[in-house]
Amino acid sequence: MRGLQAVGKVVSPAKKQSLANGMPLKRLNNHVPQPNQIMHPFLGLTQTELGLLCCTECEPRIRSGKQIIPAMVRDPMKDQTEYTHAKLQFPLLTNISAWVKDHAMYQYSSEKQLVSAATLPAFKAAETEIPEAIRAVCQPSAQSIEGIIAAGVVSTEDLFQFLLETYPARAKTILPILLREYQKLPPAELHLEGTLHRALLAFEGQTVDKEDIEVLNRLLDNYSTEFGRRYEQVLDATVLQQLLRFYISGSALTNSRTTLQFLLKRGVCPIPEVLDAYFLLLEKAISVKSQPDLQARRLAKMACIAGCAPILKHTITATMLRVLTGCAAHTGEILHLVELAAGMPSCKEVLQENAVQLVNAVSSFAPSPAVENCTNISLLLQRLEQIYPDGLPKQFVHAASQAYMHNGNWGAAAVIWNRYGVPEGLVEIPVVNIRCRFPGFRQEDRQHLETLLKSK
C-alpha cells in the first residue's frame, strides 16, 4: 500500500513519503471512499450533514466536496490500494443512502470502550534468586556475565534481571549481551517478560538511540519466533506501555504507532503523559523540514493517528488538541475536536490553551472570500459560548478579534468588543486589502471600530 509504506521507517516516515507532492491522484477524483476506507479519527460527520446529503439532488457532497479526506482508495489501473486525499462527492444519487447506512454501521462497529493504563495493576516481576557470592563478583560486562552463566549457578533470566536492577545506567551495555545470551537458550528456558520489564525500566530517563531499538526489536522477534506467537499477544499491557515509552524516547515513530495499536486492541488507553509524548514525536518526525509539502505532511500524520478515534473519546490533552488542530482541513473537523474536548473533565483549560490555534485554523481554511472565514469564526464562538456560559476567556476574545479584523469584518470585531471590552494590548487596527460591501466590512464599520479603540 503506497503511502502507508512510506511511514514504515524507524525515525521519520515523512523522509520517505512516496506521495512527493501530496496532491490527490487525478484518476481517482470521482472515487468515493467507503466508510471503512477513510483514515480519519476526527472526521465527525454530524447527523445534519448526513441528512442534507440524502436530501440534496444537485451534486450532493460532504465537506464542500473538497479533496481533504485521507483514505485508502483502490486504483483499478494499478490494481493496488493508494493512500491519498479523497473527496466525499457523490456522482450517483442512488448510492448515497447505502453509503450513509454503511457509515452508521461502521461507526457502531468501531466503537471501543477503553480503560486507562493508570488503572491497570502494576506488573510484578518474579523475585531474583542470586547468591551473595555471585552478587559480590557480578559486573555488567560480557566476560563476567559469560563466566557466571557458564558456571550454571543462576538462571540467565535471574542474572539479567539482577544486573538491570542493580546497574540501570549500564543498560546500553547489558542489552546486547542479553540478546546474545538469550539466543543460546532453548525455548523452554525463555522467560522474556520479566527481563524486558527490567530493561525498559532501566532505560527510563536515558537517551535511546537507533542501536538500542534494533537490539530490542531483535530480542522481541527472537522471542516471537521461538514461541510461535507475536510478543504483543502475550506481554502484559503495563509492559506494552513501557515499550511504547521506550520507542517514543528513541523517536521510533513506526514502532510507536504499532505498539499503540496493540494497546488499543487490548482495550487500553495509555496515560496522558505517554499520549502527549507520542503526539509530540509525531509533530517532530513529520515536520516542515522533513516534509515541506503541506498535503503530504498531513497524509503522513493522519496515517499515524488513523486508529486513534477511541482514544479521542477517552482522553484529549492540550498538547493532543494542538497537534490535531494542525492536522485539520475543515471547520467541521475543528468543531468536532471542540465537541470531543468538551467531554473531558478539564475541557475548559484544554480549550483555553489552544484558543489561538483553534481560531486561526477556522479563519484560514478559505483563502477567499473573507465572509466564509468569518462565518467559521462565528460558528466556533457559538459552540464555545455554550462551554463557557459565563463569558469567553480573554484568550478567545483576543484571538477572535484579531481574526475578524484580518478578514476585514470590522462589525463582528465591534460586537465582540461591545460584549467583552477591547482586548488588552491592542494598540491599532490592522490594514487589510479586502473589498466587500457587506454590512460589517464597509469603511464606516472600520471607522466605528476605530472610535471604540480610542474610547477604551
From Swiss-Prot:
Belongs to the AEP1 family. It is found in: Mitochondrion. The keyword Mitochondrion applies. Keywords: Mitochondrion, Transit peptide, Translation regulation. It comes from Eremothecium gossypii (strain ATCC 10895 / CBS 109.51 / FGSC 9923 / NRRL Y-1056). The keyword Mitochondrion applies. Required for translation of the mitochondrial OLI1 transcript encoding subunit 9 of mitochondrial ATP synthase. One of its GO terms (cellular component) is mitochondrion. This is ATPase expression protein 1, mitochondrial. One of its GO terms (molecular function) is translation regulator activity. The lineage of its organism: Eukaryota, Fungi, Dikarya, Ascomycota, Saccharomycotina.
